[in-house]
């Protein structure tokens, strides 16, 4: 890796990515069932 990230930045990035994935899944499921 070219840039060295701190553990807190990596943790925040993982949390944001997880929330985005969960929101996308819930949205697709709700659209699929309607």
Swiss-Prot record:
It is found in: Cellular thylakoid membrane. The chain crosses the membrane at residues 10-32. Belongs to the PsaM family. GO terms for biological process: photosynthesis. Its main location: membrane. Keywords: Membrane, Photosynthesis, Photosystem I, Thylakoid, Transmembrane, Transmembrane helix. Coiled coil: none annotated. GO terms for cellular component: photosystem I; plasma membrane-derived thylakoid membrane. It is a single-pass membrane protein. This is Photosystem I reaction center subunit XII. InterPro entries: PSI_PsaM, PSI_PsaM_sf.
């Amino acid at each position: 890796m070219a840039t060295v990230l701190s553990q807190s930045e990596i943790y925040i990035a993982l949390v944001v990515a997880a929330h985005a994935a969960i929101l996308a899944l819930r949205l697709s499921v709700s659209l699929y069932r309607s």
